[in-house]
Amino acid sequence: VALVTFKEVEKIFFKDRSTSYAALRGFNLEIDDREFFCLLGPTGCGKTTVLNLLAGFERPTGGAIELAGIPVTGPGRDRAVVFQGDDSLYAWLTARENIEFGPRARGVPAKERRALADSYLNLVGLRGQGDKHPHELSGGMKQRIQIARVLANEPRMLLMDEPFGALDAQTRRVMQRELTKIWQATHTAVLFITHDIDEAIILGDRIGVMRAGPESNLKAIVEVRMEGIHDRNHPRFIEYYRQVHALIEEEVNQTLSQEGAG
């Protein structure tokens, strides 16, 4: 049974009374509970718009979006967003206090809060780092704290918008492995936005490839069976890469030919 459903979703942005831009048109997608779904596509194809609609930050112009059969009409605790930067961490709080923030707002007792925060610190590989402030942590560690903090709110789904995009290549690969471990431990459903084909193959159960904008929708969905393999030289990885790259290249070439004709 699908956890998330997009049905014929349309999103039009109005610049002024006479100018509009249709980012999405006829967008359909189902994401299953416990699934890790990666959304990939050319720049400007509407990937982040899809995430913002599911997060409730934007309202669709047409169509319907449901989570667990309930219409999405705004932000909610059942969805947690992890952004690319680390600005969402509270600089004046320790790592543990950042993780405790949500449970404290829900009235969870102090002793239970601390135990919960420590369990998530352990889950993200940061045991013993709870008393440090964000400025004392590396970029990768800050992202792990962000993930731990949103998981402490026990969401039905994680929404991740290129969360590792600002990290160096080596740290990014470490974080991909860590995120795989975290997902295997929690099986919280994930919508992961990326422009990196490698990253999508390593992380995703399925990869949705979007058409170039405007009026974007899903071009294809590729089922991935890497089963925890992070070797980019593995024959299975290479085959998936070729398949996904061909889909995206087709969209990019089509856009370039249209621009040339114009």
Segment roles from a protein language model:
Residues 63-75:
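Conserved ABC transporter NBD signature motif
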Residues 158-161:
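Catalytic Walker B motif of ABC-type/P-loop ATPase nucleotide-binding domains
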Residues 152-156:
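A short, proline-enriched helix->beta-strand linker immediately N-terminal to the Walker B motif
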Residues 100, 111-129, 181:
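Conserved ABC ATPase "signature" region
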Residues 93-100:
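Short coil-to-helix segment of the ABC ATPase nucleotide-binding domain corresponding to the Q-loop/switch region
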Residues 40-42:
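The feature captures the beta-strand-to-loop junction immediately N-terminal to the Walker
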Residues 55:
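Helix-to-loop junction immediately C-terminal to a conserved catalytic motif
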Residues 133-137, 141:
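Conserved ABC ATPase signature
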